[in-house]
Amino acid sequence: MVNFTHVSEFVLLGFQGGPGMQAMLFLIFLILYGIAVVGNLGMIVIIWVDAHLHTPMYAFLQSLSLLDICYSSTIAPRALANSMQEDHTISFGGCAAQFFFLSLFGITEAFLLAAMAYDRFIAICNPLLYSVSMSHQVCVLLISGSYLWGVVNAIAQTTMTFRLPFCGSNEINDFFCDVPPLLSLSCSDTFINQLVLLGLCGSIIVSTFLIVLVSYIYIISTILRIPTMQGCQKAFSTCASHLTGVCLFFGTVFFMYAQPSAIFFMEQSKIVSIFYTMVIPMLNPLIYSLRNKEVKQALRRSMQKLSL
């Protein structure tokens, strides 16, 4: 008979190294998190105060900025604390909560990026129907639906993962509570969990990516048919920033979770984890502001008001 011991806490191993290494990690995490919070908060405020940006496109962007703040805040505070102290433990409940919110915000962002692609598709391919197809009610429905699916996924994943019996080592070879390292600590067969992970999360990621892909195939084909170069550039500039953000998000997710489990627990995987949990939330406000003329104009108007 196997003796299952109840695990009351986990140890987040993170990156191994001496005090110098940990101090450097603290500085890196602090800079990434600080820029992510300030940048995304600034984006939310600019869209909120500038009436010219009160459109569905920027409502989605505002929601994305809020998601990025929440997403990075689920990881960064714990990572900062662990890099400055020897005790890297996290309670069972704390690990479950972190896991839940990571699942919630990650899947919600995938749906939100798909909704943003659909918004650009309607705006460029069917501009005469835009006010009807992307009304305020539709916009609210798409945003709330994204969160709803995120909650459903998070509840399913968290319930199935933390109902597993854990025995032996309680060391998670990462700096946050993620699915693969948690499943490796379970004493029981995790085939059903892996099947649900592949079926639920995999289908969500693939389906949202396909929505984005099909939308941009139509968008690009429509842009290429615009007779004037100026019109073509203007149309492409409205979706170039979103396309960049989509490539960063889905490219990193596919790289992270589509690789064989045998090579998952490598230091490179931890670096990729930092990229999609901290670097992407930091880059998004820069991408959407520096490559968007309307946001830059709104920023100038806000600066002029402050200088008066």
Swiss-Prot record:
Membrane topology: Multi-pass membrane protein
Extracellular topology ranges: 1-26, 82-95, 159-203, 267-269
Locations listed in the record: Cell membrane
Cytoplasmic topology ranges: 48-58, 117-137, 225-245, 291-308
Listed InterPro entries: GPCR_Rhodpsn, GPCR_Rhodpsn_7TM, Olfact_rcpt
Pfam families: 7tm_4
Disulfide bridge map: C95-C177
Alphabetic keyword roster: Cell membrane, Disulfide bond, G-protein coupled receptor, Membrane, Olfaction, Receptor, Sensory transduction, Transducer, Transmembrane, Transmembrane helix
Protein name: Olfactory receptor OR9H1
Annotated source species: Homo sapiens (Human)
Organism placement in taxonomy: Eukaryota, Metazoa, Chordata, Craniata, Vertebrata
Name of the gene: OR9H1
